[in-house]
Amino acid sequence: MSDFKAILAKLADGKSLSRDEAVAAFDHLMSGEATPSQIGGALMAMRVRGETVDEITGAVSTMRAKMLRVTAPDDAVDVVGTGGDGSGSVNVSTCAAFIVAGAGVPVAKHGNRAMSSKSGAADVLASLGVNIELTPEQVGACIAKAGIGFMFAPAHHPAIRHVGPTRKELGTRTIFNLLGPLSNPAGVKRQMIGVFAKHWVEPVAQVLKNLGATAAWVVHGSDGLDEITLTGPTYVTELANGVTRSFTVTPEDGGLATVANADLRGGDATANAAALAAVLNGVKNDYRDVALLNAGAALVVAGKAHDLKEGVALGIKSLDSGAAADKLAQLVAVSRA
């Protein structure tokens, strides 16, 4: 791409790319034709200046154009965190996904192996017996039959492999940490996204609005968690009816208590899988409560609950009735069929 030098020169001068320039730039970066120097230079220039809403919107458009799609119902939701919050916590959004599915909302969960924690969504689900190496058609069948399916990011975003080695060598967060959660292969229009820093809450909601999302909550816990936290307030930007608004929520808004020193420490995939299964099977602890808060918000985004308190109440019903645990059993069975 001869124009790429012009794009790099623009980035080197500290200038921002337009949405169309970002589409073209990321098309080149993910084409297999970009050199490691070009990839590293572009990613670091954006990172140092701070990526803009237009750049992220353009990059996501390119990611979505190149991804292998999954068929899912129009009302499907995703509950996902960017990761990279450095907390090494249990898998909150993965647990919340089963609670949401148990409440009757189809879930198209997008995720990957661990980035900064010891165990990502893919690691935990594999440890629970879910077959994560599925074709897009098989994932679609999981969503249709079990009400929940897991899309393993590398299988649906093959173009990402071209930037993988450079990202690893850079060893720092780049725009790609934000692109994954925004590039759900099932094209869900309703999302609950946790981000690793407060300053990303509003811009990510704006990107979702630009790309035609119906409803979303983008959240960041005041303790640094890329989820709604149990330890204090959480910053939220909500997208509803084409309008974004920002506010904070506390556990009390969901009918739960703030726990100053919530024990959400995670271990390896086996330990985190056991902790997740325990919550689905009725154990009451901090992990259950934080999963309920996040599931409650996802149920608001799904249009199933009017507010966080009602969402949490529906989540409790999903757990206590055994419906959430049934969803895990069904996903294991269908994914291995």
Curated annotation (Swiss-Prot):
It catalyses: N-(5-phospho-beta-D-ribosyl)anthranilate + diphosphate = 5-phospho-alpha-D-ribose 1-diphosphate + anthranilate. 5-phospho-alpha-D-ribose 1-diphosphate binds at residues 81, 84-85, 89, 91-94, 109-117, 121. Its cofactor is Mg(2+). GO terms for molecular function: anthranilate phosphoribosyltransferase activity; magnesium ion binding. Disulfide bonds: none annotated. It comes from the Bacteria. It holds the Pfam family Glycos_transf_3. Binds 2 magnesium ions per monomer. Gene3D superfamilies: Nucleoside phosphorylase/phosphoribosyltransferase catalytic domain, Transferase, Pyrimidine Nucleoside Phosphorylase, Chain C. Keywords: Amino-acid biosynthesis, Aromatic amino acid biosynthesis, Glycosyltransferase, Magnesium, Metal-binding, Transferase, Tryptophan biosynthesis. Mg(2+) 1 binds at S93, E227. Pathway: Amino-acid biosynthesis; L-tryptophan biosynthesis; L-tryptophan from chorismate: step 2/5. Anthranilate 1 binds at G81, N112. The keyword Isomerase does not apply. Homodimer. This is Anthranilate phosphoribosyltransferase.
